[in-house]
Regions:
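Membrane-lipid interaction segments
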Residues: 1-466
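Extracellular LysM carbohydrate-binding repeats and other cell-envelope/extracellular binding modules
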Residues: 489-518
Length: 518
């Protein structure tokens, strides 16, 4: 089995909605943080099109001047249904669709009404699994004397396991004793770092880190705002029938988001009944592909010595693993904040790595994009102390892949491995990040597969035109096979006549050929 991308399409579309605050929400003073996430609910392939139904989940944090909490969370989802035109699509096709939010903007119309604008990107891919039947020898009349055939070994990469699965992780995260109890969660962010998959016998090992940030309103009369950030290990195994240690993994993963765009994070009581535990239910959607490298012998060419042998061929394509590459790059930048109030502290930062341009060069795969950065700060303004700023930090990096071409299949996965944002003098942010890129490059090997042969008598004029004996001077690219084909002689005969140990020739080497020897 082998796999390939049958076709892929990318579309952009916009969403806009005026949103009235629910009656139980206090008036808006100023907006603080906003986040949008695409949740795909249904994919329906049709004839030459794919219908995608989903939601734009949103979370909006704002300040209020009313009594009670200073910060208020507003979350929900907006439904959408889009048709993606894909020429050649059939209802029986299996289509994968990924959705991302390219831009999400929230504007305040008045204290009770918001305007939401979003630019969404949908990427649809049809991947197919196919088999290539290739000849390994000849039988019948052509297998006898007077016919030369060449069998060559080839390294191919076969698809051993292909499936989708979900890896689940439940974790209870207790607050340190110095932190007050939780009344309600105002904002949270869950992200993955350094995720790796290792094939084992009948299972997949998963390891990495989960970074958790939570901004919450504490219990008590003051209802103070506190934040807590921690990193917990992501590890475990997933049952995978047929899995073996020697298989090569190419696994794409994504964090399952709830309707509001975040994994499930709840408040749970501890043994004393106090609300001091964060309950995290984390689910990873996995697109699992495990490959196996194998050497196979293929009939590549055939010609006749005493008769004309005409092969019937068709175009075929094999896959070969070129490289499994991971590369990292550091990105640093200084950004002047445009917050308005003097900043006291950087409370939290989060970012998403986007690849805007991918190009194959002589050095490898050149990537250009940005880190979409959100920074939450505490300011001197007592009425609206929490303020956020968004920045785009550009990067450029080349994954060093020797021998890659534009026809090879290489899907690059990007990850924000480290992020540190510090406050400098003069309201300037110092950004330091480490980006990680990984890809599995599959080389497409086109070849002509021999499906059959037709035998004919050799034209007597062709045989008559061959010299009785000749000294042939090898040109670049010549070998005994090409010479034997040209002069209708067996390769073994030419080799023995010239006392050669191999079929390879160097340019300018002299080869004696005698007509009629077999």
């Amino acid at each position: 089995h082998m796999d390939r991308v049958k076709r892929s399409t990318v579309i952009q579309f916009t969403m806009e909605e005026d949103l009235n605050l629910p009656e139980d929400k206090p008036d808006i003073s100023t907006l603080n943080l906003e986040k949008g996430e695409v949740v795909i609910e249904e994919i329906r392939p049709g004839t030459d099109e794919v219908t995608v139904r989903g939601k734009l989940g949103y979370a909006i944090l704002y300040h209020t001047q009313e009594t009670g909490s200073n910060l208020v969370l507003l979350s929900g989802a907006l439904p959408f249904e889009e048709k993606i035109h894909m020429e050649g699509t059939l209802p029986s096709d299996t289509v994968a669709v990924n959705g991302t939010v390219e831009d999400f903007t929230v504007n305040m119309i008045n204290s009770r009404k918001l305007n939401l604008q979003a630019l969404l990107l949908l990427t649809a891919r049809i991947e197919e699994i196919y088999d290539e039947e290739l000849p390994v020898g000849i039988q019948g009349g052509s297998a006898g004397e007077g016919v030369e055939y060449r069998i060559s070994p080839m390294e191919v990469t076969e698809l051993s396991i292909c499936k989708n699965d979900i890896f689940r992780k439940k974790e209870e995260i207790p607050l340190p004793s110095s932190y007050p109890n939780i009344y309600q969660i105002l904002w949270s962010n869950v992200s993955l770092r350094d995720v790796e998959f290792k094939p084992q016998e009948e299972k997949l090992a998963v390891q990495g880190d989960i970074q958790v940030f939570v901004l919450y309103e504490a219990e008590g009369e003051e209802r103070s705002i506190r934040s807590y950030e921690t990193t917990i290990p992501l590890n475990g195994t997933l049952e995978c029938q047929g899995c073996r240690e020697e298989l090569l993994p190419d696994i794409r993963y994504s964090l399952v988001r709830q309707e509001h765009g975040q994994p499930e994070l709840t408040i749970q009581p501890d043994l004393d009944g106090e609300e001091r535990i964060l309950g995290l239910e984390c689910a990873l959607e996995l697109n699992i592909r495990l490959y196996e490298e194998e050497q196979i012998d293929i009939l590549r060419d055939i010609y006749g010595v005493t008769k004309e042998v005409i092969p019937d061929t068709r175009d075929a394509s094999l896959r070969q693993l070129l490289a499994r590459i991971t590369g990292k790059t550091k990105v640093t930048d200084h950004r002047k904040t445009d917050i308005g109030s003097p900043v006291l502290q950087v409370l939290h930062s989060e970012g998403i790595v986007t690849i805007d341009h991918q190009e194959t060069t002589e050095e490898g795969i050149r990537l250009q994009g940005s880190i979409d950065l959100t920074v939450l700060c505490i300011t001197e303004n007592d009425e609206t102390p929490y303020v956020s700023t968004r920045e785009q930090i550009p990067y450029e990096y080349t994954l060093n892949v020797q021998g890659v071409t534009g026809t090879d299949q290489a899907e690059v996965h990007s990850e924000l491995e480290q992020l540190q944002v510090n406050l400098l003098e003069g309201e300037e942010l110092d950004v330091k990040a480490v980006l990680s890129f990984s890809t599995t490059v599959m080389k497409n090997i086109p070849l002509e597969a021999i499906e059959g042969v037709e035998e004919q008598e050799i034209d007597s004029n062709v045989l008559a035109g061959l010299p009785s004996a000749v000294i042939y001077i090898a040109a670049p690219g010549d070998d005994l096979w090409s010479i034997g084909r040209k002069y209708h002689m067996p390769v073994k005969t030419v080799r023995e006549l010239n006392a050669l140990e191999s079929d390879e020739l160097r340019p300018g080497q002299k080869v004696l050929l005698v007509k009629g020897l077999a």
